[in-house]
């Protein structure tokens, strides 16, 4: 059975351009939720993307819906794939990644394996997956869901959510969270540079960030 829904509105470009400047690892200093399982890892180094989540879900071997998604996805979209717990069949390989890149997709995030790592590297489309598998999905035309709420890496992803992802992790945000979260992270990243400069000159980090002073205060109360 197929479930085919309409594409969601895209996140405005000014928000994704802001969000891509924010490192997920910086956001993780003040936000605990919305991060996918760290076992879903980037297959390409030094890549960060931020865009609109477009989702699909299929279980087992029938990956027909992946090919359907390639005809729907827009520039600036990130395809998020719920594999229903399947860890054996690769959801995408070189051909799908090449087609996704040609359609303008920013990347693919799979709660399951991918394949054709050499071609993925050659084509340069950022892909996150739970490793690799030589056993692939097939087009059997039996089932698949497009643009439905999915679970990926333990996080519910609704079509139209914002995604920011790099080799440190993947974060899902609602549109109304983007500006505040991104600006806070960017400020933290900017503040770190002068702090590291002080460390380079000989100061100790726990003196700069107040850790030593706070511990002395706590110990003095004993």
Predicted regions and their residues:
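C-terminal binding/interaction regions
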Residues: 163
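Beta-strand-loop-alpha-helix segment that lines the small-molecule cofactor/substrate pocket
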Residues: 166
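Feature captures the catalytic cores and cofactor-binding loops of soluble hydro-lyases/lyases
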Residues: 1-159, 173-222
């Amino acid at each position: 059975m197929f479930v085919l829904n309409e594409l969601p509105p895209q996140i405005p470009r000014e928000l994704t351009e802001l969000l891509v400047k924010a490192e997920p690892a910086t956001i993780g200093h003040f936000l605990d939720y919305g991060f996918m399982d760290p076992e879903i890892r980037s297959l390409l180094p030094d890549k960060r993307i931020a865009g609109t989540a477009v989702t699909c879900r299929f279980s087992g071997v029938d990956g027909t819906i992946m090919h359907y998604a390639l005809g729907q996805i827009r520039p600036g979209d990130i395809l998020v794939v719920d594999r229903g717990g399947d860890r054996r069949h690769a959801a995408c390989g070189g051909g799908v990644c090449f087609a996704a890149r040609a359609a303008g997709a920013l990347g693919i995030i799979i709660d399951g394996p991918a394949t054709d790592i050499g071609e993925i590297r050659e084509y340069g489309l950022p892909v996150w997956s739970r490793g690799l598998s030589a056993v692939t999905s097939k087009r059997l035309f039996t089932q698949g869901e497009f643009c439905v709420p999915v679970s990926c890496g333990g996080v519910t992803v609704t079509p139209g959510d914002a995604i920011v992802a790099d080799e440190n992790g993947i974060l899902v945000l609602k549109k109304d969270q983007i500006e505040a979260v991104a600006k806070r992270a960017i400020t933290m990243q900017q503040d770190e540079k002068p702090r590291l400069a002080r460390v380079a000159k000989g100061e100790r980090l726990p003196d700069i960030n107040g850790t030593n002073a706070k511990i002395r205060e706590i110990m003095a109360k004993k």
